[in-house]
Amino acid sequence: MTYPGPPRPAHVSATPLAELAGQMGAATPERDAEVTGITHDSRAVRPGDLYAALPGARLHGADFVTQAAGLGAVAVLTDPTGADRAAATGLPVLVVDDPRGRMGELAATIYGHPGRDLLQIGITGTSGKTTTAYLIEGGLRTVRSTGLIGTVEMRIGDERIKSERTTPEATDLQALFAVMRERGVDAVAMEVSSHALVLGRVDGCVFDIAVFNNLSPEHMEFHSDMEDYFRAKAQLFTPQRSKLGVVNFDDEYGRRLVEEAGVPIVTFSAEGHPDADWRAQDVEVGPMDSTFTVIGPKEERITARSPLAGPFNVANTLAAIVALAAAGLDPQAAADGIAAVPGVPGRLERVDVGQPYLAVVDYAHKTDAVESVLRALRKVTEGKLHIVLGCGGDRDRTKRMPMGAAAARLADTAVLTSDNPRSEDPLAILATMLAGAAEVPSHERGEVQVFENRAAAIAAVVARARPGDTVLVAGKGHEQGQDIAGVVRPFDDRLVLREAIQQTQG
């Protein structure tokens, strides 16, 4: 039988429900049960599961306990508001005030604490998490059997699984760790979002190494302000969450984290700051990669290459080298393994069908990232620089004007278009972006065009491209769908860009 959701381990020793109740300090149900799994999704229940019925924004998981029981749940974990509905199924019920906050530790217990058998490296920050995770996994691959968990995909050895979110829910995450252990994986590189830290998705995890890339405004629809955002990220650098931190000394929040972290910290600086433990020197940024020398804490010199373009990817590559060195790998061997990584899906990913100009797709979907990518591409562009860019609906509205302004100021042509409008009016989003572009003084502003239809926007920018130019399609990166009014339609920037180029050549 095929079950929805991420994979589960094939073999799990049953845990008595009474043991789980004792672990949480909850009242022991009159009836015991043998628990072999846990899920928060009633549709993904398997026989032997503890079903975590969580309170939600609109519905309560207890509304679905009958479905869970029908699929083979042997017990329910819920809060006081869900207790009566859960008890009505006749299943034993564990009642705690914060079931979401407890299910990570329960999942770890049920699956036999699989994370303890893995080298766990977690990466957090506003930008660069995905790239750094891929680079770390690439370096680890040279000496270990690896796993990867992040925005684009999950990997267990060579098996690839599509990701639903950057960091899985705690119940799924512990199951994934157990599958990795079962299949001989012994090291995992994993993105850790601020949502994951606040919502308890990494409860039950203690990372061997936690990496901090940077912090800039993002997710302001979720966090009240930058202080709240920083506090969320800083949770990863406490003894409950990690053993050692690797922190970007070039970032102002990184320097603050060095002072406030509750675990030992190793610092790195792509800008060559003399106070950092590890620093980059002799940086040469090329059109598709960069080379540099890493100076270590004992003044050792390591030859390094970032397989991705842009100064920001020097920082991501340096972060990966330092994390792997902290994990005990030889730094030069780590750097060589990272240099061999073939690229990261949707991160400065080149689309080449023989056209006489550079065409790339990038996930940049916040102001800092858009500015960084445009500046990096400007350095390697002989002709004109063109960007296609939109802003997602039902997300942080404060970044729309700055993103429109950044595109207009730093590109010769800025084609503003739809990203994932979700439930919002695409034209209203575009009007806000356009207002931002209009604030750029005319003598600093490139040509600005607006197309609601993303495919039309891509076709328009391709039609303008001349030899020596660069075309950047930004915002969606690896994504393979576009969410318009709650309906996700197939849409892959890489394929649409490729087809547009082929049509102009045809």
From Swiss-Prot:
Q: How is it modified post-translationally? A: Carboxylation is probably crucial for Mg(2+) binding and, consequently, for the gamma-phosphate positioning of ATP.
In chain numbering, motif Meso-diaminopimelate recognition motif lies across 419-422
The EC code for this enzyme is 6.3.2.13
The protein's required cofactor(s) are namely:
Mg(2+)
Give the residues the record marks as binding UDP-N-acetyl-alpha-D-muramoyl-L-alanyl-D-glutamate.
S42, T166, T167, S193, R201
Q: Which GO terms describe its cellular component?
A: cytoplasm
Q: Which InterPro entries match?
A: Mur-like_cat_sf, Mur_ligase_C, Mur_ligase_C_dom_sf, Mur_ligase_cen, Mur_ligase_N, MurE/MurF_N, UDP-N-AcMur-Glu-dNH2Pim_ligase
Q: Which residues carry this modification: N6-carboxylysine?
A: K233
Superkingdom, natural source: Bacteria
Record-annotated residues binding ATP?
G125, T126, S127, G128, K129, T130, T131
Q: Where does meso-2,6-diaminopimelate bind?
A: R395, D419, N420, P421, R422, G475, E479
Where is this protein found?
Cytoplasm
Which one of the record's GO molecular function terms can you name?
Answer: UDP-N-acetylmuramoylalanyl-D-glutamate-2,6-diaminopimelate ligase activity
Q: What does this protein do?
A: Catalyzes the addition of meso-diaminopimelic acid to the nucleotide precursor UDP-N-acetylmuramoyl-L-alanyl-D-glutamate (UMAG) in the biosynthesis of bacterial cell-wall peptidoglycan.
Name of the molecule in the record: UDP-N-acetylmuramoyl-L-alanyl-D-glutamate--2,6-diaminopimelate ligase
Instruction: Give the encoding gene's name.
Output: murE
